[in-house]
Amino acid sequence: MSSDFFIPDPEGLIPSAEGYFGAYGGKFIPEALVAAVDEVAVEYDKAKSDPAFAAELNELMVNYTGRPSALTEVPRFAEHAGGARIFLKREDLNHTGSHKINNVLGQALLTKRMGKTRVIAETGAGQHGVATATACALFGLDCTIYMGEIDTERQALNVARMRMLGAEVVAVKSGSRTLKDAINEAFRDWVANVDRTHYLFGTVAGPHPFPAMVRDFHRVIGVEARRQILERAGRLPDAAVACVGGGSNAIGLFHAFIPDEGVRLVGCEPAGHGVETGEHAATLTAGEPGILHGSRSYVLQDDEGQITEPYSISAGLDYPGIGPEHSYLKDVGRGEYRAVTDDAAMQALRLLSRTEGIIPAIESAHALAGALDLGKELGKDGLILVNLSGRGDKDMDTAARYFGLYDADAAVEADADSDRAEIEGDAK
């Protein structure tokens, strides 16, 4: 299999030399980190032009990650979407269970090139942490993962996985005790230990070069999916759909389709209990431009410019910022961003589980809910591509509590009977 990683960007889509996508991006960091961030940028530029780097990354993607990931049509699920055809890009089938391994392997190789011996990372749902711990075990690197205390509780399985892989997991007890605060602590660690440490940033946010670099490592998703759907459906999709927190899985899918003007790029943000309640993390829906974690982008903030606390049932989407390229795509009208509530996402999770035998991550379920609505808009001639960014093993405790699956057997069976009747009725 040839490399899908360093294909030249379509003209005009790379950031400026200063890392800007239009008005968004840049590098807003303390002086103590300037040299380290500049080193990452220089080494990444060298790696992009080094065939040996691309070959090593490609070998890992194929023989370790298991790429290319499958493209799966889900006709029974699609019956609930107005009959539009729906295909899932199965990033959930990657080693470690999500898209996160794509970026992690690339940055782990870069860490080796820089001669660093220690890696730190933030994680929300735990998938980036698990992928980072996996790569560190593979390459013999010391690993510390920062995770909000609330997220360590709702993602206890992934905490155990990280520790099994040899990582130190630090529960962050400051602020909202979620992803934003984990990133803050990771930056503090990097300042204190910059000589031997690389911060393996997990999304397309942060200071330049991280938004472009993380995107580049994930763009294989869209490159593969574009080729696969042309082979399977004979044409490009009407829409490419992905969940959006920081935005890495979404930009990985979208990027290959940006030049295809007939393909709508639809990002599904977490509306939580409803955007109108204030309890959400729908940054592009309700945010304003500001500075967060080293770059300028849309952020959730109050009238005084202070970052507000986000909320989502999904730990991986519970973030008050967004990658700067998404902000640019929103402003120029190339990207569409919709807000999906907790309830809509959870119903989509259960529907996919019971119609197709695939249990998605709660993050991915936001995209599935968006696809259901989009399918009803497009009708039976519609063709939708959804990035299934991760599997739902990590979310089973949350799902079980949400749906009452820990209740008595009789209650569970009654719930299942009700669902089957609803599904059969909708399909008629």
UniProtKB/Swiss-Prot annotation:
Domain of life: Bacteria
Catalytic activity: (1S,2R)-1-C-(indol-3-yl)glycerol 3-phosphate + L-serine = D-glyceraldehyde 3-phosphate + L-tryptophan + H2O
Cellular compartments per GO CC: cytoplasm
Residues that bear N6-(pyridoxal phosphate)lysine: 100
Pathway: Amino-acid biosynthesis; L-tryptophan biosynthesis; L-tryptophan from chorismate: step 5/5
Gene Ontology molecular functions: tryptophan synthase activity
Alphabetic keyword roster: Amino-acid biosynthesis, Aromatic amino acid biosynthesis, Lyase, Pyridoxal phosphate, Tryptophan biosynthesis
Keyword Lyase on entry: yes
InterPro entries: Trp_synth_b_CS, Trp_synth_beta, Trp_synth_beta/beta-like, TrpB-like_PALP, TrpB-like_PALP_sf
Required cofactor(s): pyridoxal 5'-phosphate
EC number(s) stated in the UniProt entry for this protein: 4.2.1.20
This protein's record includes keyword Amino-acid biosynthesis: yes
NCBIfam families found in the cross-reference section: trpB
Quaternary assembly: Tetramer of two alpha and two beta chains.
PANTHER family, alphabetized: TRYPTOPHAN SYNTHASE (PTHR48077:SF3), TRYPTOPHAN SYNTHASE-RELATED (PTHR48077)
Described function: The beta subunit is responsible for the synthesis of L-tryptophan from indole and L-serine.
Family: Belongs to the TrpB family.
Name recorded for this polypeptide: Tryptophan synthase beta chain
The species this protein was found in: Streptomyces griseus subsp. griseus (strain JCM 4626 / CBS 651.72 / NBRC 13350 / KCC S-0626 / ISP 5235)
High-level lineage: Bacteria, Bacillati, Actinomycetota, Actinomycetes, Kitasatosporales
Gene that encodes it: trpB
